[in-house]
Amino acid sequence: LSIRRQRQMCIRDRLRGNRPGADAGTPRLLRSDRPNVVLILLESFGRTIMDETVNGEPVMPNMQRFKREGVWFENFFANSFRTDRGQVAVLCGFPAQTTMSIMKLPRKSATLPSLARSLGREGYRSAFMYGGDLNFTNQASFMYSTGWEKLIWQKDMQLDAPTSKWGYADDVVVDLFGDEVEALGREEQPFLAGLLTLSSHEPFEVPFAKFDDKLLNAMAFSDAQIGRLIDRLRESPVWDNLLVVLVADHGYPYPYDLAYNAPLRHRIPMIWLGGALATASRTVDTYASQIDICATLLAQMGLPHDEFDYSKNIFGATPPHKFGYYCFSDGFGVIDADGETVYDNTGETVLSQTGPQSERLEWGKAMLQTTYEDIGRR
């Protein structure tokens, strides 16, 4: 990337989420400093699909319901187009890469800061569940090395239920996950519980028949299971001190002609729900992306996030200019309230730019170059 080192470091320093005063002015969204946290990664839940209707019927009625009930992040973006890179962004606040995945480099990924490790220092237990194979893309090694205590996946479940290409369908897995959350809630320690769904992954094989389009039908199935899970937890004693974070692992190219590098391809939902919230039915318009979850959540709990260089507190005072950032195959996009810039690094070409001239191009170059230099040092 053709950006001078001194200028790059100056820009990068301005974009750091852990600068002094980063949490100044942060509004309090939680009733408790130590809520139990449920973090659900929703496979391929692109924003365009969430907003879709078929003959007037919403594809994701439960997500639409939760959007109205909880804290809704209107301008939120995935950092990548793959689950493994999205997981690292959400769980470690570390930016995705264009042509590699740090998750597959265990000695390097083990050095990343992580939400599980930060909460573990505060006495939190942690458990993560997935209905498929957590050895895929080295997920299990990554999860253990970044502080998750307990992993539950397909090999542990041994269910009398059919499996798809990727594992057990979401309907049976959310029931097990509900059991796990309620069991953790009966213990004295606070907890962090994570779930990665899978039924909305292609080839979209689900025990469900609502829409003719296989993609939309699978998305509707997963939405229905998340709706059942949230409604179950709402009726459980665990709900009173529970914060549920619903966020996609990445988006999906829908409509089917949506360009792979378009900002809309990477726009995803994020919703906060639960009895631990002091506020509800709130819309957050700030531009942000998956890497900002760690700092935002830790700041709400009054905990430090100094380790997370790239993660910005969405509600904090610094950096003053908030934006969403994503990577595609050797390129990046930066989106803020003024417009968007999409850059192809291979061709050294700005593919699209809207809004007034800004520093978005330099921000993106600094983020991408700094990410790779950081990985090289680990």
Report each predicted region and the residues it spans.
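Solvent-exposed soluble domains appended to multi-pass membrane proteins
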Residues: D13-R378
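Single conserved hydrophobic/aromatic residue that forms the stacking wall/gate
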Residues: L1-I11
